[in-house]
Amino acid sequence: MASPGTTPSFSPAQLAGLSLPSSCSKTANDVIAFSNSYTGNAFRQTMIKTWQDEAEAAQAAGCIKGYKILNTAENTATEQIAQIQSLLLTGVKAIDIDSASPTALNGVIEQACSQGITVVVFDSLASTKCEYDLGDDIPVISTEMAQGMAQLMGGQGNMMIVRGLVGTETELPKYQAQLDVLKNYPNIKVVATVTGQSSEAIAESAVAAELPSLPQIDGVLTAGGGDSMGVVAAYQNAHMTVPPVALDNSGQALQFWSQSIPSGYKTVSIGAQPGVASAAFWETLDLLNGAKGIPKLMQAPPIPITPDSISQWEAVTPASNIATYLYTLAETNQLIQANYGGGPLPLPPVPTSAP
């Protein structure tokens, strides 16, 4: 991947079929909607705020007439389908979707496309041919998280795995990628696997229920989606030493890590960025304004946080948020160019202020 803040350059030949609009004049009277399938963790809550902030900025600039946001609380596909069906009756020109299922929403998405509505699915994807997808680089996130935790454990010891939001498009590939890494460490024994549903409260309860029956845990590999501090809380409430826990880039987790560094605590933190919602918004606006050649499937880079950068990220990440970066239209277009041209994905710089 490119270094943070760099922009890949491409030749005209590499970008010959890509055409991005220079204005948003075509969408001044349009209403854009966002359908989100889950609100139970800081990642999704940060994502909702990110998308809304960009929509409000676009509305203030005269790029859109208005926007709508509909949320389902518990990742229920049937409820999300009903909400999208209601949007189809309101005259929206585009719908951005964070999907409850890789397949269950396909019918209603195809219905939207048949009505001429532009559909961009991001973070947790669906699988129709008509949608545009902006996903997270799951192999990189999961592989680096598992690799980092295995190395912290010295390649041996007892591990607990905390799975994420089971049923979404990203969870099973993430879990499988972690298991693939662990195959290279035969002296690491997975002694417990629990489901945290990417929720701090659910992860805390699930881990707390297992701790009395477990041997010493030398590392906890989480899903990195809003559950890590639930694991930490379970150990703290049990008055047990917190082992290395793969953190999820939440402000609360970064504060915990920063405060624990003087005592020698080590961990790994890399995660998808909820700011992908801002890139999805601007991609949608590009499409509505006549963009040509945007790939149907694109990826956004994760945010790795290290001991060298934690103080910077902690300073701009409120406790209730996830470390993220708000993409501008120009930066979204750079991301589109990188995906189109096959170059490295540009990592966002550390923001200078909280989103």
Residue ranges and their predicted role:
Residues 1-355:
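A residue-level marker of the well-folded mature domains of exported/periplasmic proteins
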